[in-house]
């Protein structure tokens, strides 16, 4: 079974399932391992991890092989790379989406964070003893998106390794994206990255091209909700400043009225990104509703104050109760506006002081009346 690894700060889940769709369109039997769910070919379930621990991974791989899977696409987190959570798993190839500030509570510096991501390229390269030669098709493919943070740096650093490093950019797309229904320039990059790796994996160009038009938003990735609000309402997993800026900018392009952002920042995690998220929302949304997003052991009010420190005089509403915050945006937004509920996406719980209570942004939006 070929195992394909997708790493980067934002976009891993989307690239993973899109690549799986492309390989399936090419007649391959493909499972996947994502933050949201695992698909072994016979069942779908959640592990609670982006990249599960090795014993769980081995069980997943064994079940996939039993089901006749030819391929598995999996998300590879920086934590998993640093901890070698995947053991001696032999990857057939991989892709890098981008690198923006996140997980500095773990990696401490952006340099260490980048090196963890680069280490995945080193792991891919360790499976061959060949010398790095540009364009060598027999080397493990490593598709690198040049559009996002650290893309050029990753391309240059991986280029000295024995890998078939494939540059990908939406500025010079090799596929026609006119039929793509996934909104946002970042999704163009995500789809092109998956397409490049699919082609390197043996999927015919025309097959991948035809599959692009059949992709639909899913799993709280700019997923539109049917609600009683006068505005269009979307749920998205954006939980970094870069992701927040990207998704709000994408929505701006088709919104004639105001763009509303409902968001917070996780507790007991990288606190340095909080004012950056506030700044991103202040610069790309017309109105922000700042709320709680898994405060964990921290004081929600203090997290919100840190977010606000980056917002200047931007218009905002502060409501620590996430349900009330969502309802506030949905009730005040007008026809022609768009509301984007950010941060949790597919998640179905809110963690406060060690207790996880049921909470699904999508369900809360549907309950609004």
Question: What are the residue ranges of the model-derived segments?
Answer:
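Acidic, Mg2+-coordinating active-site environments of NTP-dependent enzymes
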Residues: 67-70, 89-233, 308-312, 317
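Phosphate-binding loop of NTP-binding sites
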Residues: 1-143, 154, 159, 255
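Hydrophobic anchor at the start of a short beta-strand
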Residues: 29-31, 71-72, 165, 259, ...
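Short glycine/serine/threonine-rich phosphate/pyrophosphate-binding segments
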Residues: 14-18, 76, 80-81, 189, ...
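Short gly/ser/thr-rich secondary-structure transition/capping motifs
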Residues: 52-55, 74-80, 112, 167, ...
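A generic structural signal for residues located within well-ordered alpha-helices
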Residues: 14, 52, 116, 186-189, ...
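ATP-dependent carboxylate-amine ligase
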Residues: 136-137, 196-220, 224-369
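Glycine/Thr-rich phosphate-binding loops of Rossmann-like dinucleotide-binding domains
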Residues: 82-84, 104-105, 152-154, 243, ...
